[in-house]
Amino acid sequence: MGLQGQLSDVSSDSIPLMLLALLATFFRHVRSLLLFPSSAPVVVVTSNLSVLADQLNLNRLFSYRYSDNAASDCIVCLSKLKTGEEVRKLDCRHVFHKQCLEGWLQHLNFNCPLCRSPLLPHHHQGHGSDASISAFPLRSTSTASSH
């Protein structure tokens, strides 16, 4: 089945974004290993990419043309939402430009830009994080030396 089977419902526009997020996470991890080798954090890349893929897919599926006459602002770009623009309303009822929310997600922010409520329910956020394989080996933070 592999990666292709898992990403079959993700738009082709989302794949470069996921690869970019993976590369950014990899370089951030390598940098942390070089700068702070004894306290390097455990990075679970597959979990973050899974959440990113889910969010990009939801953003694509649940975006719509804005038609409200009320003067609302997109808190990400600080512009007024105009009739006919592609927007996405989150579960917390906040509305953003579709492209602005995608940019927010590219930075691995999985919460509302305004109220910080999680974009995915807690039971879904934890899904896969225990079962996923870390892309980097676990580092012991204990003071005992094995040399």
From Swiss-Prot:
Pathway: Protein modification; protein ubiquitination. A zinc finger (RING-type) spans 74-116. Its EC number is 2.3.2.27. GO terms for cellular component: cytoplasm; nucleus. SMART domains: RING (SM00184). GO terms for biological process: abscisic acid-activated signaling pathway; cellular response to hypoxia; positive regulation of abscisic acid-activated signaling pathway; protein ubiquitination; regulation of response to osmotic stress. It comes from the Eukaryota. CDD domains: RING-H2_RHA2B (cd23123). GO terms for molecular function: transcription cis-regulatory region binding; ubiquitin protein ligase activity; ubiquitin-protein transferase activity; zinc ion binding. Interacts with NAC19. Expressed in vascular tissue, root tips, embryos and pistils. The ring domain is sufficient for the interaction with NAC19. It is found in: Cytoplasm; Nucleus. Disruption phenotype: No visible phenotype. Keywords: Abscisic acid signaling pathway, Cytoplasm, Metal-binding, Nucleus, Stress response, Transferase, Ubl conjugation pathway, Zinc, Zinc-finger. It comes from Arabidopsis thaliana (Mouse-ear cress). It catalyses: S-ubiquitinyl-[E2 ubiquitin-conjugating enzyme]-L-cysteine + [acceptor protein]-L-lysine = [E2 ubiquitin-conjugating enzyme]-L-cysteine + N(6)-ubiquitinyl-[acceptor protein]-L-lysine. This is E3 ubiquitin-protein ligase RHA2B. The lineage of its organism: Eukaryota, Viridiplantae, Streptophyta, Embryophyta, Tracheophyta. Its main location: cytoplasm. The keyword Endoplasmic reticulum does not apply.
